[in-house]
Amino acid sequence: MASAQTGTEMSPHHVTRTYKHENFLSFISTMSEKETVETTQEPKQVVEPTQELEELAIDGDQAAAKKKKSKKKKKKAVSLDKTYADGVFPEGQWMEYPLEVNSYRTTDEEKRYLDRQQNNHWQDFRKGAEVHRRVRQKAQQQIKPGMTMLEIADLIENSIRTYTGNDHTLKQGIGFPTGLSLNHVAAHYTPNSNDKVVLKYEDVMKVDIGVHVNGHIVDSAFTLTFDDKYDNLLTAVREATYTGVKEAGIDVRLNDIGAAVQEVMESYEVELDGKTYPVKCIRNLNGHNIGDYVIHSGKTVPIVANGDMTKMEEGETFAIETFGTTGKGYVIPQGECSHYALNQDIDGVKLPSERAKSLVKSIKDNFGTLPWCRRYLERAGEDKYLLALNQLVRAGVVEDYPPLVDTSGSYTAQYEHTILLHPHKKEVVSKGDDY
């Protein structure tokens, strides 16, 4: 989920653009080798032609029967607690820290011991990440042009509920509203219940999915297109995100990550309908660190050089996300709001009405400080809540997050991973075979 930053515009760092760019995927992507299966043949028996034909016919009937049977045995999605009954979930991709001063961490027994003490904490993230991988695989297979945004959101969110095996949102489940931002809309759009938008073949959709287990949030996103003319835009953003992941680590300055991301992102161009566009970083969107039940926990990870000398620290969790655009490279809030979150410091704030009080109680009971959308309120049984909700926003009790948009007619893309800064190595916990 994107972190937006307000302030003065910054001139993009000038970088020579090239069409051939070193693929940073080689630093972090685990490529699975193709398996080769050797077959051995039994010595062929000599049979009469009529017997051979009869045996082939029998074999064919049996194969057809097996095929028919296998179609009926389609696997049904179940809670991962049944799949991983021992509570040990797949680890993410491990990476060394980039700085030489951190090289000792890999072999330091004390650091590894401290890491083991937080094993339950890490298992929550790994479970959330495995849910995320399965949900996005299903989404990538099933999302097609012609589907409504509501159908797509339901597909993703119901899959999260199935794989976590729990509809109690505070224990585990959806980490934040499913982002389905289209084209020039970069972030913070999910359909409200009256939404009629239909996905089109020419759309560029950012799919931003959050899964949490006991408040430990996995935040990861990809961009879905059906027309390959956008490939260079997607490649630029994906490689920029990989660069951010590679550069991140304990004691790394946030500015240095932003500078590296910008250099990669802005070395790309994309040709759309005969016109060439430079790919720009959206300079006021950032990655962020993640706290327990808090998606944006204070630090922001820039995607351009911005002079921030703040360092990443041991034990922190970060969402490394980058946004590229064919537009201005700067987003503004615009459009009907769907994303909200309860502010953490509301003790002593006078609530404006009895309806507002009951709505705050419902929000606390169902979401705590996790972000939510209007559809989730309705699922929790709330109706006729809009007036009270707007009162809470004006009172500063609830924060609203409207859609963030670049220039109309432009195209934006996003990729994102969650990383865990262990004492000895970093873990790209959301890494999968897809990205």
Swiss-Prot record:
It is an enzyme of class 3 (hydrolase). GO terms for biological process: protein maturation; proteolysis. Residues 57-77 are annotated as: Disordered. A divalent metal cation 2 binds at residues 219, 288, 321, 416. InterPro entries: Creatinase/aminopeptidase-like, Met_Aminopeptidase_Type2, Pept_M24, Pept_M24_MAP, Pept_M24A_MAP2, Pept_M24A_MAP2_BS, WH-like_DNA-bd_sf, WH_DNA-bd_sf. Binds 2 divalent metal cations per subunit. Has a high-affinity and a low affinity metal-binding site. The true nature of the physiological cofactor is under debate. The enzyme is active with cobalt, zinc, manganese or divalent iron ions. Most likely, methionine aminopeptidases function as mononuclear Fe(2+)-metalloproteases under physiological conditions, and the catalytically relevant metal-binding site has been assigned to the histidine-containing high-affinity site. Keywords: Aminopeptidase, Cytoplasm, Hydrolase, Metal-binding, Protease. It is found in: Cytoplasm. The keyword Cytoplasm applies. It catalyses: Release of N-terminal amino acids, preferentially methionine, from peptides and arylamides. CDD domains: MetAP2 (cd01088). Its cofactor is Co(2+); Zn(2+); Mn(2+); Fe(2+). GO terms for cellular component: cytoplasm. Belongs to the peptidase M24A family. Methionine aminopeptidase eukaryotic type 2 subfamily. This is Methionine aminopeptidase 2.
